[in-house]
Amino acid sequence: MFPMVTEFMNYGQQTVRAARYIGQGFMITLSHANRLPVTIQYPYEKLITSERFRGRIHFEFDKCIACEVCVRVCPIDLPVVDWKLETNIRKKRLLNYSIDFGICIFCGNCVEYCPTNCLSMTEEYELSTYDRHELNYNQIALGRLPMSIIDDYTIRTVLNLPEIKT
């Protein structure tokens, strides 16, 4: 009879321990109930990107001197710069400039090392297409400034997203 009593006591202790673990999990669940949601409703709400966000590259054709520094500092030699040497003035004339965003890793080296500041990073991050050949932007497409998230009246911007504590 003595082993049966100890087994019953062990069973009771295990039951109490299991109830305590369930209670701890339930308390954690309840503590998260009064927090704000971390996710946003993406197409209808957008986060305002930070100042240093590295989005699509903007190119100013008039400022470019075709020095090809952007090509040399790019880890994957991505920008394609076509130029012609003007012999009478002994300067390069830019003919075509293009970047394939399907290959670009958005490192920002081209923007950082450009001597004339003709390249800049924008806040545009919606570059998805059904055809990857549409991601090859020429100087005309690179010259378009994106519509600012703040100016877009069709979406609601989320300014204060709660910080995630780890």
From Swiss-Prot:
[4Fe-4S] cluster 1 binds at residues 64, 67, 70, 114. Keywords: 4Fe-4S, Chloroplast, Iron, Iron-sulfur, Membrane, Metal-binding, NAD, NADP, Plastid, Plastoquinone, Quinone, Repeat, Thylakoid, Translocase. [4Fe-4S] cluster 2 binds at residues 74, 104, 107, 110. Residues 55-84, 95-124 form the 4Fe-4S ferredoxin-type domain. The keyword Membrane applies. It comes from the Eukaryota. It is found in: Plastid, Chloroplast thylakoid membrane. Belongs to the complex I 23 kDa subunit family. This is NAD(P)H-quinone oxidoreductase subunit I, chloroplastic.
